[in-house]
Amino acid sequence: MYNGKDRAQNSYQPMYQRPMQVQGQQQAQSFVGKKNTIGSVHGKAPMLMANNDVFTIGPYRARKDRMRVSVLEKYEVIGYIAAGTYGKVYKAKRQINSGTNSANGSSLNGTNAKIPQFDSTQPKSSSSMDMQANTNALRRNLLKDEGVTPGRIRTTREDVSPHYNSQKQTLIKKPLTVFYAIKKFKTEKDGVEQLHYTGISQSACREMALCRELHNKHLTTLVEIFLERKCVHMVYEYAEHDLLQIIHFHSHPEKRMIPPRMVRSIMWQLLDGVSYLHQNWVLHRDLKPANIMVTIDGCVKIGDLGLARKFHNMLQTLYTGDKVVVTIWYRAPELLLGARHYTPAVDLWSVGCIFAELIGLQPIFKGEEAKLDSKKTVPFQVNQLQRILEVLGTPDQKIWPYLEKYPEYDQITKFPKYRDNLATWYHSAGGRDKHALSLLYHLLNYDPIKRIDAFNALEHKYFTESDIPVSENVFEGLTYKYPARRIHTNDNDIMNLGSRTKNNTQASGITAGAAANALGGLGVNRRILAAAAAAAAAVSGNNASDEPSRKKNRR
């Protein structure tokens, strides 16, 4: 019968009760260990000191600077697109380096000829040897079929057969040029470099963190990030158009309504992107036509997440972090009334304002913004609230039950009573679809609790009961093309980055090398000791120089 107690006792026998063979093996192992530790201290192997260059900060930083790839080394800047409070956005394309070969094959006329490779360093089994034989046979047949002789690679059909065609026809098509948008954040004020580096802005940190986590076809895709000369460069996929440009095209020089089918497609894709943000607990807080991009293939993408913020498990209130959010014309009424906490409904109000602007070709609530005073006090936006009341009417407790709870509620009592004029405005702007007007009412609801959310807005009759289904391409069915985005090529201040970076890298390398030579290649610990010794010597020297004066004073 199995006895667990006996097994436990056998497992933990004292050393003297174990078989002599085991003890002999342990003695032999201990003897070998002692034999290998001859010349060591207390039987321990001596520590091998690493190369001092590893612990030297100067050469390490210089080496990292030399290895770092500059944004201008990887991208060719064509010009800048727009400028704002955060900095500038540039249009760029990838640099083409025709002199280097790729890892998969050599470069042929700007393209990589990929031939299956086999790693000869790995142990080969029978199946792997058969695979290699098949690969070699395939390679020989490929060269034979293409008329390629060793040492000569042909890229035209003329070299293959003289009876084919006298005109050269390239087998490999040249790839299309892919453009990118580089967003450079400001580090200088009024063209003068700051004396003290204040670090990366909060807006840049939020945008980098969120763009690295969020992935949706209706959000601008972040390609990579560069940190160069204390400046952040964020590389995005390029979008040829934005809603502000499209609205301007239809409103100048004379008004021409945007096709209803195009408006429906834009709104559906926009709401789909907003729904994705809200389902991932992210508020955008700056939705406006200028931040809604449209690619050349008609895909709507939401950009500029500089004011975006997660609203799940917050450490502080939304008002504490940012007291002013959303551009004034697209700001929700609860924000105008001083709400300290708000919901994703503020984004849906902005979407409603964008919807109205696509219909009327101008902002529906175009108020004048009151600026901050010298004390940086947030002013009450009287004119903006008045523009909203003139179109939607004056709210009351029946429409907005918690209206009296807002800090700036008393401001509403100062206005005269307005009636609802949204339907009148809609028909005067040329709107004919009753479902579009219904969705507009749901998006521009005063009460943020009753305001429709993005998920339910996608199921609205405006999208589900239309004669023409929603298209994934907003340009589908158009007989005209929108002009390309205007690029400013006369103000490429980012081009000065390359020469300054190169000079600074060389200077830092020289300075670091000189410092390392002066200290004799000392490691970090020895450098600290040397500095401490120098400081002690300086102090003792000062004390010795002060000693004669003290003696004179005593006399």
Curated annotation (Swiss-Prot):
Subunit structure: Component of the SRB8-11 complex which consists of SRB8, SSN2/SRB9, SSN3/SRB10 and SSN8/SRB11. The SRB8-11 complex associates with the Mediator complex. The SSN3/SRB10 and SSN8/SRB11 kinase-cyclin pair also associate with the RNA polymerase II holoenzyme. Interacts with TUP1.
Compositionally skewed regions (Polar residues) per UniProt: 100-138
Outcome reported for the amino acid change (mutating D304A): Abrogates kinase activity and transcriptional repression
GO cellular component: CKM complex; mediator complex; nucleus
Main location: nucleus
Protein name per UniProt: Meiotic mRNA stability protein kinase SSN3
Transmembrane portions of the chain: none
Keyword Transferase attributed: yes
Ranges where the record places region Disordered: 100-166
Gene Ontology MF annotations: ATP binding; cyclin-dependent protein serine/threonine kinase activity; metal ion binding; protein kinase activity; protein serine kinase activity; RNA polymerase II CTD heptapeptide repeat kinase activity
InterPro entries per record: CDK, Kinase-like_dom_sf, Prot_kinase_dom, Ser/Thr_kinase_AS
Residues bound to ATP: I81, A82, A83, G84, T85, Y86, G87, K88, V89, K183
Annotated function: Component of the SRB8-11 complex. The SRB8-11 complex is a regulatory module of the Mediator complex which is itself involved in regulation of basal and activated RNA polymerase II-dependent transcription. The SRB8-11 complex may be involved in the transcriptional repression of a subset of genes regulated by Mediator. It may inhibit the association of the Mediator complex with RNA polymerase II to form the holoenzyme complex. The SRB8-11 complex phosphorylates the C-terminal domain (CTD) of the largest subunit of RNA polymerase II RPB1 at serines 2 and 5.
Family: Belongs to the protein kinase superfamily. CMGC Ser/Thr protein kinase family. CDC2/CDKX subfamily.
Pfam families in the record: Pkinase
